[in-house]
């Protein structure tokens, strides 16, 4: 009985995802191939999308809504360069009280919209002492210290396998393209491992030391669930952190106030 209930719940999740995607597909003239998830203070990138369509999260059936300052709460679909894209201007966080299937809900909607590549951004605290506030970091891998995983429970076979491979969670080909673009544009780009904590408290100095010992270069409260679900769904993913501050214990400074300003 318990298994039957879990299976029914997963079917309901699948149906809710499809309803959200169908709502957009019926109205949009685009079939986006690239998804963008824009983190704290980074949503202004969506303003560069041309001939854009806007879908407020509150208007999309079954979509959660963001409660975080600096997150607009809408999908922007249009053209960026010569590519059709869909951008999340504002993401959902585990610490807001959402289950991880809701945090990652938009990624699966993107999959049904036709997205095959995903670019994820976030604001993060630097753990690596050779980094500086304001640096950009290309994510090479992640460590999940959130205490949970969005794939817990019955697998939704329509999206991916029960045990997805995470050996290249951040696609090497896409990472190399980002490195090439940064070099051409003369943008300093660090590389490192992103460590997710659940939040909403910032990490303690002891937790930051632990993250550093375990091989982390930056810490934050997002990204990992979306990347896991994207990989499960067969979406190639690349991630970039804007290092808005040095993590706790590295410098003696307050943490949240400069995030949006530095990101912009």
Task: Identify the function of each model-found stretch.
Residues 10, 14-166:
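Metabolite-binding pocket within alpha/beta catalytic cores that recognizes anionic/polar moieties
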Residues 205-247:
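A C-terminal functional module that forms or caps the active site or interfaces directly
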Residues 23, 27, 173, 177-187:
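Generic non-transmembrane alpha-helical segments
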Residues 84, 116-117, 188, 217, ...:
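Residue-level detector of anion-binding/catalytic polar loops
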Residues 184-217:
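Active-site/ligand-binding-proximal alpha/beta "capping" segment
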Residues 1-9, 13, 260-264:
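Single conserved hydrophobic/aromatic residue that forms the stacking wall/gate
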Residues 248-263:
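His/Asp/Glu-rich mid-to-C-terminal helical/loop segments that flank catalytic regions of hydrolases
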């Amino acid at each position: 009985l318990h298994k039957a209930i879990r299976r029914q719940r997963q079917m309901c999740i699948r149906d809710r995802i499809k309803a959200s995607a169908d709502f957009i597909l019926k109205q949009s003239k685009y079939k986006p191939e690239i998804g963008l998830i824009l983190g704290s203070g980074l949503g202004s990138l969506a303003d560069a999308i041309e001939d854009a369509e806007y879908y407020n999260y509150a208007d999309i059936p079954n979509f959660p809504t963001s409660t975080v300052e600096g997150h607009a709460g809408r999908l922007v679909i249009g053209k960026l360069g010569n590519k059709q894209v869909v951008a999340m201007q504002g993401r959902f966080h585990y610490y807001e009280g959402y289950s991880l299937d809701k945090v990652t809900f938009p990624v699966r909607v993107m999959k049904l919209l036709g997205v095959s590549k995903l670019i994820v951004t976030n604001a993060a605290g630097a753990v690596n002492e050779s980094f500086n506030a304001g640096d950009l970091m290309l994510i090479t891998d992640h460590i999940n210290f959130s205490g949970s995983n969005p794939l817990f429970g019955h697998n939704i076979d329509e999206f991916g396998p029960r045990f997805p491979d995470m050996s290249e969670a951040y696609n090497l080909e896409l990472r190399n393209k980002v490195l090439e673009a940064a070099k051409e544009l003369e943008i300093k780009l660090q590389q490192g491992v992103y460590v997710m904590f659940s939040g909403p408290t910032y990490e303690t100095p002891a937790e930051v030391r632990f993250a550093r010992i375990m091989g982390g270069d930056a810490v934050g409260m997002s990204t990992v669930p979306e990347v896991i679900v994207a990989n499960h769904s067969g979406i190639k993913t690349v991630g970039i952190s804007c290092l808005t501050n040095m993590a706790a214990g590295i410098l003696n400074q307050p943490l949240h106030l400069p995030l949006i300003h530095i990101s912009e």
